[in-house]
Amino acid sequence: MSVTMTLGQLAEALGATLKGPEALQITGLATLQEAGPGQLSFLANPQYRKYLDNCQAGAVLLKAADAESFAGNALIVADPYQAYARISHLFDPKPKAVAGIHPSAVVAEDAQVDASASIGPFAVIESGARIEADVSIGAHCFVGARCVVGEGGWLAPRVTLYHDVTIGKRVVIQSGAVIGGEGFGFANEKGIWRKIAQIGGVTIGDDVEIGVNTAVDRGALSDTRIGDGVKLDNQIQIAHNVQIGDHTAMAACVGISGSTRIGKHCMLAGGVGLVGHIDICDNVFVSGMTMVTRSITEPGSYSSGTAMQPLADWRKSAARIRQLDDMAKRLQQLEKRVDTVTSGGLPTSEG
């Protein structure tokens, strides 16, 4: 889908100050390095300012301070990145869903599907499910018994919702995601693992986004819960009974063990792992590849990852780590010897 807007229209949509001709047509978005005369770009990160002078964009989203020295056209805003985020939806080429149920879809007789919803080819909607207004269900999706997909939801092709999953409004779920699969619950009886039925569900709030191939397991007894505004990247594992607070974001490959609770407005970088049955308070940032083994009770930034080094230096550091226990014991012995000598009373020059 091709979209064309004038600079004047974009300025009005953003409440921006326009520096340049209102009638100039903009047909898309691009980076400072790649933008052409009919495209809009933005400068948000200072490290990219070096590309601004030679930028060929039709216009650039800029802060007032950067616009003063820029010879080209500009839309002057307080926060260029937020402005870019808003404008991006106007130029999104994603095909629009068409209301109705595809002839190849299988919809249970007692399922409720709003007339404005779109059900794609070969989708399955099971008994008791409810699909609300303006929902788009992509091809080959499976919506299990008694599921609810809230108003304005968008399920990409091949999303799976097991039974008893409740999804809020305007939720986006990408392909391959599985919501409500059975949690990893087993009881060990004399070395034999006995399966525990996972009889809870999953409850997801409004404005949540879930990435490609991410799994959110159903609760063992009560629901696994994802709060409003949560953003989950690709290939994340959310185990049974986990609770995630509003507006928390997680990058790819995070793994959260069962019954862990994460607060609001937290950020977990890529590859973070959390053990089960711990609590993370609000406003916590955890850096990439960190292993969280205990509860975090104070807001702030946390890390356990080892920073990159040249290989030879890393090998030396790894060898020293193995020696730390022995070195600590030797240091304690030296401290005892020093204490013994000093406590015995040494002669002074004053005699």
Swiss-Prot record:
Catalysis performed (reactions): a UDP-3-O-[(3R)-3-hydroxyacyl]-alpha-D-glucosamine + a (3R)-hydroxyacyl-[ACP] = a UDP-2-N,3-O-bis[(3R)-3-hydroxyacyl]-alpha-D-glucosamine + holo-[ACP] + H(+)
Assigned EC number: 2.3.1.191
Class of this enzyme: transferase
GO cellular component: membrane
CDD domains, per the entry: LbH_LpxD
Pathway given in the UniProt record: Bacterial outer membrane biogenesis; LPS lipid A biosynthesis
Residue numbers annotated as active site: 240 (proton acceptor)
Record carries keyword Chloroplast: no
GO biological process: lipid A biosynthetic process
Stored PROSITE patterns: HEXAPEP_TRANSFERASES
SUPFAM superfamilies: Trimeric LpxA-like enzymes
InterPro entries: Hexapep, Hexapep_transf_CS, LpxD, Trimer_LpxA-like_sf, UDP_GlcNAc_AcTrfase_non-rep
Keywords for this protein: Acyltransferase, Lipid A biosynthesis, Lipid biosynthesis, Lipid metabolism, Repeat, Transferase
Pfam families recorded: Hexapep, LpxD
GO MF term list: N-acyltransferase activity
Job description of the protein: Catalyzes the N-acylation of UDP-3-O-acylglucosamine using 3-hydroxyacyl-ACP as the acyl donor. Is involved in the biosynthesis of lipid A, a phosphorylated glycolipid that anchors the lipopolysaccharide to the outer membrane of the cell.
Subunit and interaction comment: Homotrimer.
Family assignment from sequence similarity: Belongs to the transferase hexapeptide repeat family. LpxD subfamily.
Name of the featured protein: UDP-3-O-acylglucosamine N-acyltransferase
Record organism: Pseudomonas putida (strain GB-1)
Top-level taxonomy: Bacteria, Pseudomonadati, Pseudomonadota, Gammaproteobacteria, Pseudomonadales
